[in-house]
From Swiss-Prot:
Residue numbers of 4-hydroxyproline PTMs: 67, 74, 86
Catalytic temperature dependence: Thermostable.
Keyword line: Allergen, Disulfide bond, Hydroxylation, IgE-binding protein, Protease inhibitor, Seed storage protein, Serine protease inhibitor, Signal, Storage protein
Protein name, as recorded: Conglutin-7
InterPro entries: Bifun_inhib/LTP/seed_sf (IPR036312), Bifunc_inhib/LTP/seed_store (IPR016140), Napin/2SS/CON (IPR000617)
Keyword presence, Lyase: no
Biased amino acid composition, Basic and acidic residues: 77-98
Superkingdom of source: Eukaryota
Pfam families in UniProt: Tryp_alpha_amyl
Expression triggers: Repressed by water stress.
Length: 172
């Protein structure tokens, strides 16, 4: 009976020690993640996604035969265009691909921590939620945001709640 008591006491001690160590490990992970998020520059991700949404709206929301869309029209004259805007002939937009590359470099820092990757995606959503116009644009932004890790060749978080303007959450 004494041996059984000692074994039970030892088992409880080991269980408590394991729980304490796990809690300490998770706390360190939270601090590490918070530090990574503070150092990360997620602005290129936000810019890439907003440009992508804008391009999609431009290509789906307008008449392709409209004179304002004609790359040969005077309004599209290269001498009159803003030199920093993407070329009308470049369907992807050079600025966006630069933003995507910089974004992927930043997201790569979170690849080994799926929870932290999710928090980075949540931060991007929160930063841009005020700029999104209407439910349709918000949903499109979320779709693009969910696909962002895969576009960068990274694993996407298995479960991640994305904050929505109404205060609820969308889970994917």
């Amino acid at each position: 009976m004494a041996k059984l008591t000692i074994l039970v006491a030892l088992a409880l001690f080991l269980l408590a020690a394991h729980a304490s160590a796990r809690q300490q490990w998770e706390l360190q992970g939270d601090r590490r993640c918070q530090s990574q998020l503070e150092r990360a520059n997620l602005r290129p991700c936000e810019q890439h996604l907003m440009q992508k949404i804008q391009r999609d709206e431009d290509s789906y929301g307008r008449d392709p035969y409209s004179p304002s869309q004609d790359p040969y029209s005077p309004s599209q004259d290269p001498d009159r265009r803003d030199p920093y805007s993407p070329s009308p002939y470049d369907r992807r937009g050079a600025g966006s691909s630069q933003h995507q590359e910089r974004c992927c470099n930043e997201l790569n820092e979170f690849e080994n921590n799926q929870r932290c990757m999710c928090e980075a995606l949540q931060q991007i959503m929160e930063n841009q939620s005020d700029r999104l116009q209407g439910r349709q644009q918000e949903q499109q932004f979320k779709r693009e945001l969910r696909n962002l890790p895969q576009q960068c060749g990274l694993r996407a978080p298995q479960r991640c709640d994305l904050e929505v303007e109404s205060g609820g959450r969308d889970r994917y």
